[in-house]
Amino acid sequence: MTLLVDASATAGRPFPPYSIPVPNPVLSGSLAAWQVRHTMLHIEANLETALQVTELAAIAQLSVSHFSRAFRISFGQPPHSYVMAQRIEKAKRLILSDERITLAEVALSCGLSDQAHLCRMFRKLVGVTPAAWRRTYRLPIAAHESPVLPDATVPS
């Protein structure tokens, strides 16, 4: 999230270099930078396991309730939602990385219980099934096959 200086407040004056988009200042009650970094690294490294909020709170050296509140302020969503979003992002990378990988293998690699759970969560967060997403975004297999592009017109 970025902040922009109100143009009316600087009418007739050039924008100082520091007033171009700047990072959002630290929000009151949010996680410290080191807590965000350690939490994100732990989540990314352990997506295939069952991650618990108690485990994440211990990494941030906070109580579960304080961690959950600070996490929501820092990330804009609860820890469980963030972890699920990261699992689906990992699933997207795996789906595109190898055409032969099954959705069951993808699910297990992302810490989901089975293919049905992957499909449910994928559809909920992305809006389409993993198979439909794969067909849309996969790379062309053969030289004669053109990539699928959204809103592309067919050349005549």
Predicted feature locations:
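N-terminal intrinsically disordered/low-complexity leader segments
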Residues: 1-28, 139-156
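Basic/polar phosphate-binding segments, predominantly the helix-turn-helix DNA-binding elements
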Residues: 10-26, 50-86, 107-132
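Terminal helix-turn-helix DNA-binding modules in bacterial transcription factors
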Residues: 37, 41-45, 49-54, 74-113, ...
